């Protein structure tokens, strides 16, 4: 028996909507990364984009455990301006209370996806919205109840 390898024409993508209200960030991000890659499907093929399209709503209500929210020793995001001494840092709490709270989820998932062209294509299938409204109702997404999968998922 030969190993099955899917062809691009055989790949069927589903649309999922996940409510991130009171969900732990790392647990959600790891599950979303698996679904974006398509590793939850028996027809997974490593060199093809066989993952699903995922819509995450209520991103501003995501939860972090421990001291990660506002503590400087907790979750800190670094960036560099490109100038000498230009390293900047911010905490997850500042990002969540800022203008674009969905960036926390996008960064967490992006850092769990492979860093190549295929990973960029898979990240384009992720749609994160800060509130409960999204413009993808025409795709008829299926609700994925992440909170009920494990009691540790919800905080």
UniProtKB/Swiss-Prot annotation:
One of its GO terms (cellular component) is cytosolic large ribosomal subunit. Keywords: Ribonucleoprotein, Ribosomal protein. The keyword Endoplasmic reticulum does not apply. GO terms for molecular function: mRNA binding; structural constituent of ribosome. This protein is one of the early assembly proteins of the 50S ribosomal subunit, although it is not seen to bind rRNA by itself. It is important during the early stages of 50S assembly. NCBIfam families: rplM_bact. Belongs to the universal ribosomal protein uL13 family. Part of the 50S ribosomal subunit. This is Large ribosomal subunit protein uL13. It comes from Rickettsia typhi (strain ATCC VR-144 / Wilmington). The gene is rplM.
